[in-house]
Amino acid sequence: MTVSAAVQQQAGEAGLLPSHQARLDYRTGKGWSTAGVANGFVQGNLAIIPEQYAGAFHRFCQLNPKPCPIIGMSDPGNPFIPALGADLDIRTDVPRYRVWRDGEMVEEPTDLLAHWLDDLVTFVLGCSFSFEEALMADGLPIRHIEQGCRVPMYRTNIACTPSGPFAGPMVVSMRPFKPAQAIRAVQITTRFPAVHGAPVHLGHPDQIGIVDINKPDYGDPVPVAADEIPVFWACGVTPQAVISAAKLPFAITHAPGLMLITDLKNKDLAVL
């Protein structure tokens, strides 16, 4: 039984939404990659920063909506965002987090109970895992889900528009498709601007500064067949690169590929 199927079964037995059941599983240390888990529900990237930087980061997201589409934001010090889910606790409901100090990643805890501060503001940003359901429903293969690994992600030479201390390169996620499939993937994902929308680049990874597609900066490599082209989407891991470059004294993000699963429905984010 797959992780997603197990979550669906547990949720049905407990009378919970699959998204809620997944969060409970992660809260108690069960599970790993969230790809393909609780299908139909929106997943989000996390950027958690001190309140004094929140205004500049909010503007950074507004200036860079492709990699940083905001789907939720907390009040300072509040680990709950009720609009995103019942019993959703930012401190415990993600499989793994990253703690940053002065731009360096210093720890990868499975909860934030020992790290939480009263001035922290949480930004939840749209994730491409949300549109993968629509791709699969149309019969398109998702390689990293087929292989049970994390989606490959790469730093690029595409510069984000800066705001205050926040500046740096866009990070992209990659999924390989045959050319006809790639065209269909563009058509489908254009409907989901709240979770990165259409791709930012197709083929020729060197044109966006990717030297070796077999060596992603985040996530896991997946094979690209001779009759396939790599398709790249703006990625919500971009804030990790930006926060690192800003050298904030303290910040928290999710570990790449290990997302927050919300109670929002993917279908409700579609614009067409």
Curated annotation (Swiss-Prot):
Pfam families: D-Glu_cyclase. Gene3D superfamilies: PSTPO5379-like, PSTPO5379-like domain. SUPFAM superfamilies: PSTPO5379-like. Keywords: Lyase. Its EC number is 4.2.1.-. It is an enzyme of class 4 (lyase). One of its GO terms (molecular function) is lyase activity. Belongs to the D-glutamate cyclase family. This is Putative hydro-lyase BBta_2883. The lineage of its organism: Bacteria, Pseudomonadati, Pseudomonadota, Alphaproteobacteria, Hyphomicrobiales.
